Amino acid sequence: MTTIRQRIDTQHRDAIHDAQLNIYGNRLATCGSDRLVKIFEVRPNGQSYPLIELSGHNGPVWKVSWAHPKYGGLLASASYDKKVIIWQEVNGRWQKTYEWETHEASVTSVAFAPHQFGLMLASSSADGTIGILRFDAQTQQWQSSRIQNCHDQGVNSVSWAPGTADPAGKKRFVSAGNDKLVKIWLLNEELNEWTCEKAIHCHKDFVREAAWCPVTNKGQHSIVSCGLDGNLVLYRIADIETAEWKSKLLEQAPCALYHASFSPCGSFLSVSGDDNMITLWRENLQGQWIKIPRENKEREGMGQQR
């Protein structure tokens, strides 16, 4: 059974769309339909305190993402107003440090890459493209590019593959789209071009999110995806350079699923959907994902009524 340690009154004026802790778990960023991004300090005892309210978007803010702390205090936000904004903490004060408005429709998600890849982030958009922002340390400027025609009818999420200590390690990320596909993208370093390495069709409706597990297990990579069809799908690959991705249906929920997220250690998974409930999953020692029992059986009851 899981318990709620602390409720945080964010005082958002409308629906909250995302909440992300930084790597240390002592800062929480939230965003919502009120066009605001908020940052809170989270104490070890569970108490929280508001730090700053950031305004700069002209529409609902869908996603926020923290950069690795080696780059200082950096937070990115994605909004319906077609903008990606990067916020920076300077001498204890947060300010807008970069604004990117190249997407032609709502920016549906944003994600900073692992620090091993350098200071870079990816954004997805309803215009069907994926944006890449990379900070050039020599010029001290952000460099941008867009990958065209990534998903028909729009891209809903992006998530990076875990970083590696090997300098020759390849950069990859996964995307989910309204074309019912999950796609793996690979960077050709020589050409500086992103190409679709693999397109996987395991959903019957829009794929709302695909999340790449932030850690590998003996070289094995894992991805989960969820969609409006209620399917929660696990993808695994033993050797990402030579093997093929294998998929497994973890659950067919009686409702649409919108979000799936791994814990930082990669051993827990949270899933949420149309039933306003959060389901937690845990990977056992045999590598199997098991749903953690809960006292509230509403989802199971809904499944029986279907």
Curated annotation (Swiss-Prot):
Q: Name one GO molecular function term.
A: structural molecule activity
**Secretion signal: which residues?**
none
> Which InterPro entries does the entry link to?
Sec13/Seh1_fam, WD40/YVTN_repeat-like_dom_sf, WD40_repeat_dom_sf, WD40_rpt
- Broad class of where this protein is predominantly found: membrane
Q: Name one GO cellular component term.
A: nuclear pore outer ring
Note the segments forming the WD repeats: 11-50, 56-97, 102-143, 150-195, 202-245, 252-291
Keywords, alphabetical: Cytoplasmic vesicle, Endoplasmic reticulum, ER-Golgi transport, Lysosome, Membrane, mRNA transport, Nuclear pore complex, Nucleus, Protein transport, Repeat, Translocation, Transport, WD repeat
Role summary: Functions as a component of the nuclear pore complex (NPC) and the COPII coat. As a component of the GATOR complex may function in the amino acid-sensing branch of the TORC1 signaling pathway.
Q: Which family does it belong to?
A: Belongs to the WD repeat SEC13 family.
What is the designated name of this protein?
Protein SEC13 homolog
